[in-house]
Amino acid sequence: MHKILRKFFLRQKKRVKKQFNDKIFKKLTHLWTKKALKDGYIYNFTWEGVPIIKFPSDLIVFQEIIQKVKPDLIIETGVAHGGSLVFYASMQRIYNLKARTIGVEIDFREQNRQNCRKLFKKYNIEVINKSSTDPKVEKYLKNKIKKFKRVLVF
């Protein structure tokens, strides 16, 4: 790694530690997050045209996790509109991972399925329209997981 990049990551690590321990930073973050959730801020975003109910900063963290872990299977419980599934699968594609993405949603509505159909096919995404606590879903996923080396669950 180039020394300038090494310095960048060292400074980044120090900043994160400082911010983590900074009481004012924590308080402001808490207040902003509380207000943002109250005002529906997380409903303002899409990924490839699909609503994604996440803070944009969380997406960067998920991207970093996917880059480091390099999962060949990602499972998400609680899919809502499907945007995060598309996000995870597109990140796997960016990192050239021959991977699968599976979502489990108790109520994956038809309009969401129709909206996501092309992207789910493009990215090889599967949605299980059942409860994540259903024993049949658990059994299915346990069998599925056996075929993969690195599994990431959100």
Language-model segment annotations:
Residues 50, 57-154:
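S-adenosylmethionine/decaboxylated-SAM
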Residues 45-47:
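Short glycine/proline- and acidic residue-enriched helix-loop micro-motifs
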Residues 1-43:
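Membrane-proximal basic amphipathic "stem/tether" segments
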